[in-house]
């Protein structure tokens, strides 16, 4: 009887890479990963993508439709790549909020943008994507780049993003996805599980964080599943664009 009650009240589990962990532990484990890699995050992005991440982000910005005077929220904004570009687009009459749940990443982003002198219209907020601390109908555009796969309850996060958008506002999700052909998929698997942890070891002295990165990509919903999640959350006109043979996809949805 006691064993049955324990089972009934057992904490739900989720994935951390390929591991099955209690939900309460995932956020802590993800935080440890980003505390470890924050200082060399930009360098590793360039090394692992061959600089392609800059092109993926540029296309995302083009799709965003952000213009002067807009209010933009960049979730999991990390070291500030998107925030810096949005800052220039919205100008002095607009606002950019760079939000990240990880204080190490937020500090790196704040220091980097202040050093570049582009933080005048940027606010830095430590925030959980599942429980965004912003008013309803507040932002013209919300973006999250390479962050959604680390969120425990993705459906809750997407609904939270919908809530803070103004009617007609846009959500853009840039994330690793599923390659669209078998040859690319096999090559990408070999690259991910051999080179990525090795590069992590050599550059950051941390192979495990980059093994988690490779595993977390495989556990993330594919393009059509993520599209359906956005529709279920309440977004209209949801579309996605594959880049680099589907290794990365950017999804866009509009708040009705």
UniProtKB/Swiss-Prot annotation:
The protein's name: Ubiquinone/menaquinone biosynthesis C-methyltransferase UbiE
Location of region: Disordered: 1-21
SUPFAM superfamilies noted in UniProt: S-adenosyl-L-methionine-dependent methyltransferases
GO MF term set: 2-methoxy-6-polyprenyl-1,4-benzoquinol methyltransferase activity; demethylmenaquinone methyltransferase activity
EC number: 2.1.1.163, 2.1.1.201
Composition-biased stretches (Basic and acidic residues): 1-12
NCBIfam families listed in its UniProt record: MenG_MenH_UbiE, PRK00216.1-1, PRK00216.1-5
Protein family (similarity comment): Belongs to the class I-like SAM-binding methyltransferase superfamily. MenG/UbiE family.
Role, per record: Methyltransferase required for the conversion of demethylmenaquinol (DMKH2) to menaquinol (MKH2) and the conversion of 2-polyprenyl-6-methoxy-1,4-benzoquinol (DDMQH2) to 2-polyprenyl-3-methyl-6-methoxy-1,4-benzoquinol (DMQH2).
Reactions that this protein is recorded to catalyse: a 2-demethylmenaquinol + S-adenosyl-L-methionine = a menaquinol + S-adenosyl-L-homocysteine + H(+); a 2-methoxy-6-(all-trans-polyprenyl)benzene-1,4-diol + S-adenosyl-L-methionine = a 5-methoxy-2-methyl-3-(all-trans-polyprenyl)benzene-1,4-diol + S-adenosyl-L-homocysteine + H(+)
Pathway: Quinol/quinone metabolism; menaquinone biosynthesis; menaquinol from 1,4-dihydroxy-2-naphthoate: step 2/2; Cofactor biosynthesis; ubiquinone biosynthesis
GO biological process, one term: aerobic respiration
Positions that bind S-adenosyl-L-methionine: 79, 100, 128-129
The entry's keywords: Menaquinone biosynthesis, Methyltransferase, S-adenosyl-L-methionine, Transferase, Ubiquinone biosynthesis
């Amino acid at each position: 009887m006691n064993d049955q009650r324990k089972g009934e009240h057992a904490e739900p589990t989720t994935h951390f890479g390929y591991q099955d962990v209690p939900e309460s532990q995932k956020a802590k484990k993800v935080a440890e990963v980003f505390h470890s890699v924050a200082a060399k995050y930009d360098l590793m992005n360039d090394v692992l993508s061959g600089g392609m991440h800059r092109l993926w982000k540029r296309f995302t910005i083009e799709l965003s439709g952000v213009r002067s005077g807009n209010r933009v929220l960049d979730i999991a904004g990390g070291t500030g790549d998107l925030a810096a570009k949005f800052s220039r687009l919205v100008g002095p009459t607009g606002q950019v909020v760079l939000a990240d749940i990880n204080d190490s990443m937020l500090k790196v982003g704040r220091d980097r943008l202040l050093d570049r002198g582009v933080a005048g219209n940027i606010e830095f907020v430590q925030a959980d994507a599942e429980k965004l601390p912003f008013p309803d109908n507040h932002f013209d555009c919300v973006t999250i780049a390479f962050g959604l796969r680390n969120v425990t309850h993705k459906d809750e996060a997407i609904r939270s993003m919908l809530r803070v958008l103004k009617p007609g506002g846009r959500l853009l999700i840039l994330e690793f996805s599923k390659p669209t052909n078998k040859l690319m998929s096999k090559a990408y698997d070999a690259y991910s599980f051999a080179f990525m942890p090795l590069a992590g070891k050599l550059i950051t002295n941390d192979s495990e964080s980059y093994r988690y990165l490779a595993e977390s990509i495989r556990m993330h919903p594919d393009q059509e599943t993520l599209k359906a999640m956005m529709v279920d959350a309440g977004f209209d006109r949801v579309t996605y664009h594959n880049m680099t043979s589907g290794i990365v996809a950017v999804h866009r949805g509009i708040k009705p």
